[in-house]
Swiss-Prot record:
Disulfide bonds join C351-C417, C380-C449, C384-C451. Residues 26-314 form a propeptide. Belongs to the TGF-beta family. Transmembrane segments: none annotated. It holds the Pfam family TGFb_propeptide. This is Bone morphogenetic protein 5. It is found in: Secreted. The keyword Secreted applies. GO terms for molecular function: BMP receptor binding; cytokine activity; growth factor activity. Interacts with ERFE; the interaction inhibits BMP-induced transcription of HAMP. Glycans are attached at N209, N325, N343, N393. GO terms for cellular component: extracellular space; vesicle.
Protein backbone atom coordinates (compact mmCIF):
# COMPACT_ATOMS: atom_id res chain seq x y z
CA UNK A 1 0.00 0.00 0.00
CA UNK A 2 2.85 2.38 0.88
CA UNK A 3 4.39 1.83 -2.56
CA UNK A 4 1.10 2.60 -4.28
CA UNK A 5 0.70 5.79 -2.22
CA UNK A 6 4.27 6.81 -3.08
CA UNK A 7 3.69 6.30 -6.78
CA UNK A 8 0.41 8.20 -6.69
CA UNK A 9 2.25 11.08 -5.04
CA UNK A 10 4.89 10.65 -7.70
CA UNK A 11 2.31 11.44 -10.38
CA UNK A 12 3.11 15.06 -9.63
CA UNK A 13 6.56 14.42 -11.04
CA UNK A 14 5.56 13.07 -14.44
CA UNK A 15 6.73 16.22 -16.15
CA UNK A 16 9.51 17.80 -14.15
CA UNK A 17 9.44 20.96 -16.28
CA UNK A 18 6.29 22.10 -14.56
CA UNK A 19 3.43 19.92 -15.75
CA UNK A 20 1.66 16.86 -14.42
CA UNK A 21 1.00 13.99 -16.80
CA UNK A 22 -1.38 11.23 -15.76
CA UNK A 23 -1.88 8.18 -17.94
CA UNK A 24 -4.52 5.47 -17.81
CA UNK A 25 -3.37 2.14 -19.17
CA UNK A 26 -5.50 -0.03 -21.40
CA UNK A 27 -4.79 -3.72 -21.29
CA UNK A 28 -3.99 -6.58 -18.92
CA UNK A 29 -1.50 -6.65 -16.09
CA UNK A 30 1.24 -8.09 -18.25
CA UNK A 31 0.59 -5.72 -21.15
CA UNK A 32 3.65 -3.56 -21.78
CA UNK A 33 1.91 -1.57 -24.54
CA UNK A 34 0.57 1.37 -22.53
CA UNK A 35 -1.80 3.79 -24.22
CA UNK A 36 -2.55 6.95 -22.30
CA UNK A 37 -4.77 9.94 -21.95
CA UNK A 38 -3.29 12.96 -20.21
CA UNK A 39 -4.20 15.57 -17.62
CA UNK A 40 -1.87 18.50 -17.05
CA UNK A 41 -1.38 20.77 -14.05
CA UNK A 42 1.35 23.34 -13.52
CA UNK A 43 3.58 22.52 -10.56
CA UNK A 44 4.08 25.03 -7.79
CA UNK A 45 7.66 25.97 -6.94
CA UNK A 46 7.58 24.21 -3.59
CA UNK A 47 6.26 21.06 -5.27
CA UNK A 48 9.11 21.13 -7.79
CA UNK A 49 11.67 21.59 -5.02
CA UNK A 50 10.17 18.72 -3.03
CA UNK A 51 10.30 16.45 -6.08
CA UNK A 52 13.92 17.38 -6.70
CA UNK A 53 14.81 16.58 -3.08
CA UNK A 54 13.00 13.23 -3.24
CA UNK A 55 14.74 12.13 -6.44
CA UNK A 56 18.17 13.20 -5.17
CA UNK A 57 17.49 11.27 -1.97
CA UNK A 58 16.60 8.14 -3.94
CA UNK A 59 19.82 8.57 -5.93
CA UNK A 60 21.74 8.83 -2.66
CA UNK A 61 22.98 12.36 -3.39
CA UNK A 62 23.08 15.08 -0.69
CA UNK A 63 22.76 17.83 -3.31
CA UNK A 64 22.59 18.44 -7.04
CA UNK A 65 26.07 17.86 -8.55
CA UNK A 66 27.58 20.79 -10.44
CA UNK A 67 30.40 19.41 -12.60
CA UNK A 68 32.84 21.49 -14.61
CA UNK A 69 31.62 22.47 -18.07
CA UNK A 70 32.53 19.62 -20.47
CA UNK A 71 34.66 20.30 -23.52
CA UNK A 72 33.47 20.10 -27.09
CA UNK A 73 34.98 16.65 -27.56
CA UNK A 74 33.87 13.67 -25.51
CA UNK A 75 36.65 12.46 -23.22
CA UNK A 76 37.70 8.86 -22.75
CA UNK A 77 36.26 8.23 -19.27
CA UNK A 78 32.63 9.19 -20.10
CA UNK A 79 32.83 7.21 -23.36
CA UNK A 80 34.06 4.13 -21.49
CA UNK A 81 31.32 4.56 -18.90
CA UNK A 82 28.68 4.87 -21.64
CA UNK A 83 29.75 1.48 -22.95
CA UNK A 84 29.36 0.04 -19.45
CA UNK A 85 26.01 1.81 -19.09
CA UNK A 86 24.74 0.14 -22.25
CA UNK A 87 25.82 -3.24 -20.92
CA UNK A 88 24.25 -2.68 -17.49
CA UNK A 89 21.06 -1.03 -18.76
CA UNK A 90 20.36 -3.72 -21.36
CA UNK A 91 20.76 -6.29 -18.59
CA UNK A 92 18.29 -4.44 -16.33
CA UNK A 93 15.66 -3.62 -18.98
CA UNK A 94 16.76 -4.83 -22.42
CA UNK A 95 13.74 -3.31 -24.16
CA UNK A 96 13.95 0.10 -22.48
CA UNK A 97 17.40 1.56 -23.06
CA UNK A 98 19.25 2.60 -26.19
CA UNK A 99 21.98 5.22 -25.97
CA UNK A 100 23.83 7.16 -28.62
CA UNK A 101 26.45 9.83 -28.08
CA UNK A 102 27.14 12.95 -30.14
CA UNK A 103 30.58 14.41 -30.87
CA UNK A 104 30.02 16.80 -27.98
CA UNK A 105 29.64 13.86 -25.66
CA UNK A 106 25.92 14.39 -25.03
CA UNK A 107 24.09 11.14 -24.32
CA UNK A 108 20.64 10.74 -25.83
CA UNK A 109 18.03 8.04 -25.60
CA UNK A 110 16.32 6.76 -28.71
CA UNK A 111 13.09 4.82 -28.64
CA UNK A 112 11.87 3.29 -31.85
CA UNK A 113 8.26 3.98 -32.69
CA UNK A 114 7.63 6.57 -29.99
CA UNK A 115 5.21 9.26 -31.17
CA UNK A 116 6.02 12.50 -29.38
CA UNK A 117 3.50 13.92 -26.93
CA UNK A 118 2.89 17.69 -26.71
CA UNK A 119 5.72 17.96 -24.17
CA UNK A 120 8.12 15.54 -25.79
CA UNK A 121 7.06 12.48 -23.80
CA UNK A 122 6.60 9.05 -25.28
CA UNK A 123 3.13 7.52 -25.35
CA UNK A 124 4.35 4.04 -26.17
CA UNK A 125 6.73 2.41 -23.73
CA UNK A 126 7.84 -0.82 -25.36
CA UNK A 127 10.73 -1.72 -27.62
CA UNK A 128 11.60 -5.04 -29.24
CA UNK A 129 14.96 -6.33 -27.98
CA UNK A 130 17.83 -4.67 -29.84
CA UNK A 131 21.58 -4.47 -29.45
CA UNK A 132 22.44 -1.16 -27.71
CA UNK A 133 24.36 1.39 -29.73
CA UNK A 134 27.92 1.85 -28.59
CA UNK A 135 29.91 5.02 -28.12
CA UNK A 136 33.03 3.59 -29.75
CA UNK A 137 33.96 1.18 -32.51
CA UNK A 138 35.29 -1.06 -31.14
CA UNK A 139 33.87 -0.39 -27.66
CA UNK A 140 36.19 0.98 -25.00
CA UNK A 141 34.73 -1.48 -22.50
CA UNK A 142 35.71 -5.10 -23.06
CA UNK A 143 33.87 -8.29 -22.16
CA UNK A 144 36.23 -8.53 -19.20
CA UNK A 145 34.98 -5.15 -17.96
CA UNK A 146 31.32 -5.98 -18.41
CA UNK A 147 31.86 -9.17 -16.40
CA UNK A 148 32.88 -6.97 -13.46
CA UNK A 149 29.37 -5.50 -13.57
CA UNK A 150 27.90 -8.77 -12.30
CA UNK A 151 29.47 -8.16 -8.88
CA UNK A 152 29.13 -4.37 -8.81
CA UNK A 153 26.32 -1.95 -8.10
CA UNK A 154 28.39 1.18 -8.75
CA UNK A 155 31.22 2.09 -11.13
CA UNK A 156 33.29 5.29 -10.94
CA UNK A 157 35.86 6.72 -13.34
CA UNK A 158 38.53 9.15 -12.20
CA UNK A 159 40.43 11.75 -14.21
CA UNK A 160 44.16 12.30 -13.87
CA UNK A 161 44.84 15.27 -11.59
CA UNK A 162 48.52 15.76 -12.54
CA UNK A 163 48.81 18.95 -14.61
CA UNK A 164 52.59 19.29 -14.82
CA UNK A 165 55.32 16.66 -15.05
CA UNK A 166 57.72 16.36 -12.14
CA UNK A 167 61.48 16.51 -12.52
CA UNK A 168 62.78 13.06 -11.62
CA UNK A 169 66.37 11.88 -11.35
CA UNK A 170 68.30 10.92 -14.49
CA UNK A 171 67.53 7.25 -13.80
CA UNK A 172 63.78 7.93 -13.84
CA UNK A 173 63.72 10.90 -16.22
CA UNK A 174 61.16 9.16 -18.48
CA UNK A 175 58.72 8.24 -15.69
CA UNK A 176 55.24 9.76 -15.73
CA UNK A 177 53.06 10.39 -12.68
CA UNK A 178 49.28 10.02 -12.31
CA UNK A 179 47.05 10.97 -9.39
CA UNK A 180 43.37 10.24 -8.76
CA UNK A 181 41.03 11.57 -6.08
CA UNK A 182 39.15 8.71 -4.39
CA UNK A 183 37.79 10.76 -1.49
CA UNK A 184 34.33 11.14 -3.08
CA UNK A 185 33.53 7.43 -2.84
CA UNK A 186 30.36 6.89 -0.73
CA UNK A 187 30.88 5.37 2.70
CA UNK A 188 30.38 1.61 2.87
CA UNK A 189 31.36 0.86 -0.73
CA UNK A 190 34.04 -1.81 -1.21
CA UNK A 191 36.25 -2.01 -4.31
CA UNK A 192 35.70 -5.26 -6.23
CA UNK A 193 37.98 -4.34 -9.15
CA UNK A 194 40.00 -1.33 -10.30
CA UNK A 195 41.93 -0.55 -13.48
CA UNK A 196 44.32 2.07 -14.80
CA UNK A 197 43.83 2.63 -18.54
CA UNK A 198 46.18 4.35 -20.96
CA UNK A 199 45.99 4.50 -24.75
CA UNK A 200 48.87 3.39 -26.97
CA UNK A 201 49.36 4.71 -30.48
CA UNK A 202 52.11 3.51 -32.81
CA UNK A 203 55.51 4.06 -31.24
CA UNK A 204 58.53 5.77 -32.74
CA UNK A 205 59.78 4.01 -35.90
CA UNK A 206 63.14 3.48 -34.16
CA UNK A 207 61.48 0.84 -31.99
CA UNK A 208 59.33 -0.84 -34.64
CA UNK A 209 60.98 -4.23 -34.12
CA UNK A 210 61.14 -3.87 -30.35
CA UNK A 211 59.03 -5.43 -27.62
CA UNK A 212 58.20 -2.71 -25.12
CA UNK A 213 57.50 -3.42 -21.45
CA UNK A 214 55.23 -0.92 -19.71
CA UNK A 215 55.07 -1.03 -15.91
CA UNK A 216 52.82 0.73 -13.42
CA UNK A 217 53.97 1.43 -9.85
CA UNK A 218 52.31 2.59 -6.66
CA UNK A 219 54.09 5.50 -4.97
CA UNK A 220 54.77 4.26 -1.44
CA UNK A 221 56.62 7.25 0.00
CA UNK A 222 57.70 10.60 -1.38
CA UNK A 223 60.85 12.54 -0.58
CA UNK A 224 61.83 16.14 -1.21
CA UNK A 225 65.43 15.38 -2.12
CA UNK A 226 65.24 12.05 -3.96
CA UNK A 227 62.95 9.77 -5.95
CA UNK A 228 59.96 8.17 -4.23
CA UNK A 229 59.84 4.55 -3.19
CA UNK A 230 57.81 2.53 -5.70
CA UNK A 231 55.93 -0.77 -5.56
CA UNK A 232 55.36 -2.66 -8.83
CA UNK A 233 51.66 -3.30 -9.46
CA UNK A 234 51.36 -4.62 -13.00
CA UNK A 235 53.24 -4.95 -16.30
CA UNK A 236 52.21 -5.22 -19.94
CA UNK A 237 54.36 -6.23 -22.91
CA UNK A 238 53.45 -4.86 -26.32
CA UNK A 239 54.94 -4.33 -29.75
CA UNK A 240 55.95 -0.80 -30.72
CA UNK A 241 53.45 -0.67 -33.59
CA UNK A 242 50.51 -2.04 -31.56
CA UNK A 243 47.55 0.30 -31.08
CA UNK A 244 44.82 0.22 -28.42
CA UNK A 245 44.03 0.57 -24.73
CA UNK A 246 46.40 -0.93 -22.16
CA UNK A 247 44.72 -2.00 -18.93
CA UNK A 248 46.53 -2.45 -15.61
CA UNK A 249 45.08 -4.10 -12.51
CA UNK A 250 45.27 -1.77 -9.49
CA UNK A 251 42.53 -3.35 -7.34
CA UNK A 252 44.62 -3.94 -4.20
CA UNK A 253 46.08 -0.43 -4.29
CA UNK A 254 42.65 1.17 -4.77
CA UNK A 255 41.26 -0.66 -1.75
CA UNK A 256 44.24 0.53 0.26
CA UNK A 257 43.63 4.13 -0.85
CA UNK A 258 39.93 3.97 0.04
CA UNK A 259 40.71 2.72 3.56
CA UNK A 260 43.76 4.96 4.03
CA UNK A 261 43.29 8.05 1.82
CA UNK A 262 46.38 9.71 3.31
CA UNK A 263 48.48 7.01 1.59
CA UNK A 264 47.17 7.89 -1.88
CA UNK A 265 50.33 9.37 -3.38
CA UNK A 266 49.49 8.32 -6.94
CA UNK A 267 51.02 6.08 -9.60
CA UNK A 268 54.13 6.19 -11.75
CA UNK A 269 54.51 4.59 -15.17
CA UNK A 270 57.60 3.73 -17.20
CA UNK A 271 58.40 2.14 -20.57
CA UNK A 272 61.42 -0.06 -21.29
CA UNK A 273 62.81 -1.91 -24.27
CA UNK A 274 63.40 -5.63 -24.17
CA UNK A 275 66.98 -5.14 -23.00
CA UNK A 276 65.90 -2.92 -20.09
CA UNK A 277 66.58 0.54 -21.56
CA UNK A 278 64.20 3.21 -20.25
CA UNK A 279 62.55 5.16 -23.07
CA UNK A 280 60.30 8.19 -23.31
CA UNK A 281 56.67 7.11 -22.91
CA UNK A 282 55.70 9.32 -25.87
CA UNK A 283 58.24 7.49 -28.05
CA UNK A 284 56.60 4.25 -26.91
CA UNK A 285 53.29 5.60 -28.28
CA UNK A 286 51.60 6.22 -24.92
CA UNK A 287 49.12 9.11 -25.04
CA UNK A 288 49.36 11.63 -22.20
CA UNK A 289 47.33 14.63 -21.11
CA UNK A 290 48.30 16.62 -24.23
CA UNK A 291 46.74 14.01 -26.52
CA UNK A 292 43.15 13.81 -27.82
CA UNK A 293 40.42 13.95 -25.19
CA UNK A 294 39.04 10.60 -26.36
CA UNK A 295 42.40 8.95 -25.58
CA UNK A 296 43.15 10.46 -22.17
CA UNK A 297 44.41 8.09 -19.43
CA UNK A 298 41.97 7.45 -16.60
CA UNK A 299 41.16 5.12 -13.73
CA UNK A 300 37.97 3.11 -13.24
CA UNK A 301 36.81 1.27 -10.12
CA UNK A 302 33.93 -1.14 -9.51
CA UNK A 303 32.18 -1.08 -6.12
CA UNK A 304 29.70 -3.15 -4.15
CA UNK A 305 27.83 -1.84 -1.12
CA UNK A 306 28.40 -3.70 2.13
CA UNK A 307 25.48 -5.51 3.80
CA UNK A 308 25.71 -3.10 6.75
CA UNK A 309 25.20 -0.15 4.39
CA UNK A 310 22.28 -1.83 2.63
CA UNK A 311 20.54 -2.51 5.94
CA UNK A 312 21.01 1.10 7.09
CA UNK A 313 19.65 2.42 3.77
CA UNK A 314 16.58 0.18 4.03
CA UNK A 315 15.99 1.29 7.64
CA UNK A 316 16.30 4.98 6.70
CA UNK A 317 13.93 4.47 3.77
CA UNK A 318 11.39 2.80 6.04
CA UNK A 319 11.51 5.69 8.54
CA UNK A 320 11.19 8.19 5.71
CA UNK A 321 8.11 6.46 4.30
CA UNK A 322 6.52 6.43 7.76
CA UNK A 323 7.13 10.16 8.17
CA UNK A 324 5.81 10.80 4.67
CA UNK A 325 2.61 8.89 5.40
CA UNK A 326 2.10 10.86 8.63
CA UNK A 327 2.51 14.16 6.79
CA UNK A 328 0.13 13.01 4.07
CA UNK A 329 -2.63 12.43 6.61
CA UNK A 330 -2.53 16.18 7.50
CA UNK A 331 -2.04 17.41 3.97
CA UNK A 332 -4.40 19.75 2.15
CA UNK A 333 -6.21 17.60 -0.44
CA UNK A 334 -5.91 20.40 -3.00
CA UNK A 335 -2.10 20.40 -2.73
CA UNK A 336 -1.41 16.97 -4.17
CA UNK A 337 -3.51 14.93 -6.61
CA UNK A 338 -4.91 11.69 -5.23
CA UNK A 339 -6.26 8.55 -6.81
CA UNK A 340 -9.76 9.93 -6.46
CA UNK A 341 -8.86 12.94 -8.61
CA UNK A 342 -8.33 10.77 -11.65
CA UNK A 343 -10.37 7.64 -10.97
CA UNK A 344 -14.06 8.28 -10.41
CA UNK A 345 -16.36 5.40 -9.60
CA UNK A 346 -17.26 5.19 -13.27
CA UNK A 347 -13.61 5.10 -14.35
CA UNK A 348 -12.34 2.71 -11.65
CA UNK A 349 -10.96 -0.43 -13.25
CA UNK A 350 -9.38 -3.63 -12.06
CA UNK A 351 -5.84 -3.60 -10.69
CA UNK A 352 -3.37 -2.99 -13.51
CA UNK A 353 -0.18 -1.21 -14.53
CA UNK A 354 -0.39 2.47 -15.49
CA UNK A 355 2.04 4.84 -17.17
CA UNK A 356 4.44 6.93 -15.13
CA UNK A 357 7.41 8.46 -16.96
CA UNK A 358 10.12 10.34 -15.07
CA UNK A 359 12.17 12.81 -17.14
CA UNK A 360 15.56 13.95 -15.85
CA UNK A 361 15.99 16.24 -18.84
CA UNK A 362 12.82 18.21 -18.14
CA UNK A 363 14.00 18.65 -14.58
CA UNK A 364 16.99 20.51 -16.03
CA UNK A 365 19.52 17.89 -14.95
CA UNK A 366 21.00 17.16 -18.39
CA UNK A 367 24.24 18.92 -17.42
CA UNK A 368 25.10 16.21 -14.87
CA UNK A 369 22.96 13.17 -15.74
CA UNK A 370 24.52 11.69 -18.88
CA UNK A 371 22.01 8.87 -19.34
CA UNK A 372 19.17 8.09 -19.41
CA UNK A 373 17.13 11.17 -20.22
CA UNK A 374 14.37 9.57 -18.19
CA UNK A 375 12.78 6.22 -17.50
CA UNK A 376 9.37 4.54 -17.54
CA UNK A 377 8.64 3.84 -13.87
CA UNK A 378 4.94 2.84 -14.14
CA UNK A 379 2.66 2.44 -11.12
CA UNK A 380 -0.10 0.07 -9.99
CA UNK A 381 -3.69 1.13 -9.39
CA UNK A 382 -7.16 -0.33 -9.57
CA UNK A 383 -9.72 -2.37 -7.67
CA UNK A 384 -9.06 -5.74 -6.08
CA UNK A 385 -12.70 -6.79 -5.89
CA UNK A 386 -14.29 -10.22 -5.68
CA UNK A 387 -13.89 -12.39 -7.66
CA UNK A 388 -10.11 -12.11 -8.14
CA UNK A 389 -9.43 -13.71 -11.51
CA UNK A 390 -6.14 -15.15 -12.76
CA UNK A 391 -5.20 -11.89 -14.52
CA UNK A 392 -4.94 -10.07 -11.20
CA UNK A 393 -1.88 -12.02 -10.00
CA UNK A 394 -3.52 -12.29 -6.58
CA UNK A 395 -1.74 -14.00 -3.70
CA UNK A 396 -3.52 -16.70 -1.72
CA UNK A 397 -3.64 -14.28 1.19
CA UNK A 398 -5.34 -11.65 -1.00
CA UNK A 399 -7.98 -14.16 -2.06
CA UNK A 400 -8.75 -15.03 1.56
CA UNK A 401 -8.74 -11.35 2.54
CA UNK A 402 -11.24 -10.58 -0.24
CA UNK A 403 -13.63 -13.24 1.03
CA UNK A 404 -13.35 -11.99 4.60
CA UNK A 405 -13.91 -8.42 3.38
CA UNK A 406 -17.19 -9.50 1.81
CA UNK A 407 -18.33 -10.78 5.20
CA UNK A 408 -16.88 -7.99 7.36
CA UNK A 409 -16.40 -4.93 5.11
CA UNK A 410 -16.18 -2.55 8.08
CA UNK A 411 -13.38 -4.48 9.75
CA UNK A 412 -11.27 -5.97 6.95
CA UNK A 413 -10.21 -3.84 3.95
CA UNK A 414 -9.90 -5.01 0.37
CA UNK A 415 -6.50 -6.22 -0.84
CA UNK A 416 -4.25 -3.55 -2.35
CA UNK A 417 -3.09 -3.22 -5.94
CA UNK A 418 0.71 -3.28 -5.76
CA UNK A 419 3.78 -4.24 -7.81
CA UNK A 420 4.51 -7.96 -7.99
CA UNK A 421 7.78 -7.52 -9.88
CA UNK A 422 10.20 -4.60 -9.92
CA UNK A 423 13.27 -3.98 -12.06
CA UNK A 424 16.38 -1.86 -11.58
CA UNK A 425 17.56 1.09 -13.62
CA UNK A 426 21.11 2.31 -14.24
CA UNK A 427 21.98 6.01 -14.07
CA UNK A 428 25.18 7.55 -15.46
CA UNK A 429 26.14 10.95 -14.08
CA UNK A 430 28.93 13.40 -13.22
CA UNK A 431 29.82 14.27 -9.63
CA UNK A 432 31.08 17.67 -8.48
CA UNK A 433 34.64 16.75 -9.51
CA UNK A 434 33.51 15.74 -13.03
CA UNK A 435 34.21 12.09 -12.26
CA UNK A 436 31.70 9.84 -14.01
CA UNK A 437 29.58 7.48 -11.89
CA UNK A 438 27.46 4.57 -13.08
CA UNK A 439 25.09 3.29 -10.43
CA UNK A 440 22.38 0.66 -10.35
CA UNK A 441 19.19 1.52 -8.45
CA UNK A 442 17.03 -1.47 -7.62
CA UNK A 443 13.22 -1.65 -7.49
CA UNK A 444 12.67 1.44 -9.66
CA UNK A 445 10.50 0.10 -12.51
CA UNK A 446 7.19 -1.75 -12.13
CA UNK A 447 7.12 -4.79 -14.39
CA UNK A 448 3.80 -6.27 -13.26
CA UNK A 449 0.99 -5.60 -10.78
CA UNK A 450 -1.22 -7.77 -8.62
CA UNK A 451 -3.52 -7.86 -5.61
CA UNK A 452 -1.86 -8.20 -2.20
Amino acid sequence: MHWTVFLLRGIVGFLWSGWVQVGYAKGGLGDNHVHSSFIYRRLRNHERREIQREILSILGLPHRPRPFSPGKQASSAPLFMLDLYNAMASEDNPEEYLVRVSLAGEAKETRKGYPASPNGYAHRLHLPPRTPLTTQSPPLASLHDTNFLNDADMVMSFVNLVERDKDFSHQRRHYKEFRFDLTQIPHGEAVTAAEFRIYKDKGNHRFENETIKISIYQIIKEYTNRDADLFLLDTRKTQALDVGWLVFDITVTSNHWVINPQNNLGLQLCAETGDGRSINVKSAGLVGRHGPQSKQPFMVAFFKASEVLLRSVRAASKRKNQNRNKSNSHQDPSRMPSAGDYNTSEQKQACKKHELYVSFRDLGWQDWIIAPEGYAAFYCDGECSFPLNAHMNATNHAIVQTLVHLMFPDHVPKPCCAPTKLNAISVLYFDDSSNVILKKYRNMVVRSCGCH
